[in-house]
Amino acid sequence: MPHLLVAHPGHELLLHGWISRNKPVVHVLTDASAHSSDARLGRTADLLRDLGARKGAIFGRLSDAEAYAMILERNTPLLLSLVAELAAELEKDQPAIIVGDAAEGYNPVHDLCRLIAGAAIEMAGVATKQYEYAVVNHPHANDSGAIVINLDAVEHAAKMEQARGQAATLTDIDAMLSRHGADAFRTEAIYPIADWTAAGGDEPPLYERYGEERVAAHRYAQVIRRREHMLPLRDALRAAVEKRSCAF
């Protein structure tokens, strides 16, 4: 049984067909409380149950505010506790793969999924392979190693029905359908991650520019930055798993 790690409830819709076919254990980092109380998390739980998937040990563990505070404060103990909890699940289940939100530079909590999943695999000492799927970018993968799921008409219709049914609370749905078109979501792709510690390019990620705009508008107090916040957390995770591996 594979595992899936997503940053926010609602992301599972992007892999609706894959979940329906594979019945994964699904972990959700946040409860999306910044947007709609716990309504989104409840809908995610209902959908997973209907699709035959199972809730993971981490399921809406953090509020959105707590997740962003963890990054801004470089709260390594909290992040390590999440990694350790996921590692325990991986060690118990020995899944062939874990799939997570892609690190696209769009949202730092999305990007955390790569770090948490990769560190958990190493901490657990399992042979689980790490994969990602596009959250914001086009769902078709160009990676030759990608696993591609082509949905049939019934699967695609079920996916679109679920997505449109949640459009009122998931504001990104309409934007994504407008940007990519409904037909783009007939295909789902997960692609392998060779190095979970890869830092990305030199260009500032989109979440930095977005954060700067929000700070200027007095909506945020501080900007989350890759070099100042994300990379120190990555380095702390890498050091922790290396220390653990040296102890055995």
Regions found by a protein language model. Give the residues of each.
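Active-site rim/loop-helix segments in enzyme catalytic domains that contact anionic ligands
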Residues: M1-Q94, G118, E122-A127
